């Protein structure tokens, strides 16, 4: 069954925070045992959204889902243990995430639409290299990850365009059976830390037919401190 975010109260003006409306659609789909959450054509600003079991977030052609850069709109990273582990507050773990899921199964992001991280509002060229415009740009704003999916089994991302991430684009941690297919990641090629695809302590990951343009790692298999302790 399909659940339109418009019917849940989303407004396609690119200004209104539609997080509550989108989350209502996700929750309704999950409560019914699964379904597709439809983002139609239009520009939808949103704070963090948490996907759930058996839910597909589907962006139709012409849809643009925009990440808020307001810290109040963004979910912080889940912390491990009692918070005393120094890895929990290490650099790179302070920005929160826009789209994610935790300890879920059968989660999909699909469609011909775009997820826009507003990285072009974060990275500033101050001409530090005297006109060559090749050095990494300055970062002067709050920078959430575009996506963080932790301990998700059967996770698929296909066909979408991920544009101008402000930090890591697609971070998967402790996930199993991951398929990334036919996506485009179009980030600033001078943006700091705007990695493309980061499988972190994951198993059975297949990345195919993707175009990835970033200012940092395009695809990097890694084992970060916090996640290696968990997985």
Each PLM stretch: what is its role?
Residues 1-231:
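Extracellular/periplasmic carbohydrate-active domains that bind, remodel
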């Amino acid at each position: 069954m399909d659940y339109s975010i418009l019917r849940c109260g989303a407004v396609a003006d690119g200004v209104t925070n539609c997080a509550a409306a989108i989350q209502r659609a996700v929750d309704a789909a999950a409560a019914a045992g699964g379904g597709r959450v439809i983002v139609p054509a239009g520009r939808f600003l949103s704070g963090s959204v948490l996907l759930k079991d058996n839910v597909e977030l589907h962006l139709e052609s012409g849809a643009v889902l925009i990440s808020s850069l307001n810290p109040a709109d963004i979910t912080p990273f889940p912390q491990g243990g009692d918070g005393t582990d120094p890895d929990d507050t290490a650099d790179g773990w302070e920005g929160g995430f826009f789209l994610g899921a935790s300890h879920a199964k059968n989660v999909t992001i699909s469609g011909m639409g775009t997820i826009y991280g507003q990285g072009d509002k974060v990275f500033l060229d101050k001409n530090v290299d005297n006109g060559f415009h090749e050095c990494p740009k300055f970062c002067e704003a709050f920078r959430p990850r575009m996506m963080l999916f932790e301990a998700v089994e059967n996770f698929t991302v296909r066909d979408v365009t991920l544009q101008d991430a402000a930090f890591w684009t697609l971070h998967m941690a402790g996930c199993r059976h991951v398929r990334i297919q036919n996506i485009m990641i179009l980030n600033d090629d001078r943006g700091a830390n705007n990695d493309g695809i980061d499988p972190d302590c994951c198993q059975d990951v297949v990345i195919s037919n993707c175009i990835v343009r970033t200012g940092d790692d395009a695809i990097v298999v890694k084992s970060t401190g916090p996640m290696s302790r968990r997985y």
